[in-house]
């Protein structure tokens, strides 16, 4: 990340910018996420509220939210308390989903996270079409 860029689309959260302790800026833990109705992700999870585990330092800068949505990227998962973007998708693409959390943290061999299951299914279908 270039700290001198004039367009900080991805950046540290404002309250984290003055923290200098190594690891002190990491967003850790399980957080609620409200999913947009009828989004691909809400259909994958089968609900409009999820809770997922995080471990990251940087966030999407909401100052760019409108501009991104006007150009096809939809922010379909938002933390209800902080209003941070948790999930994006591009509906016109076959399977284009980005998340701030780690779906692998809530996965086991016998019970994988729904996003992982859906991604693998989409990859199989794509491979069969090639």
Regions found by a protein language model. Give the residues of each.
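Amide-donor transfer/coupling interface in amidating biosynthetic enzymes
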Residues: 1-130
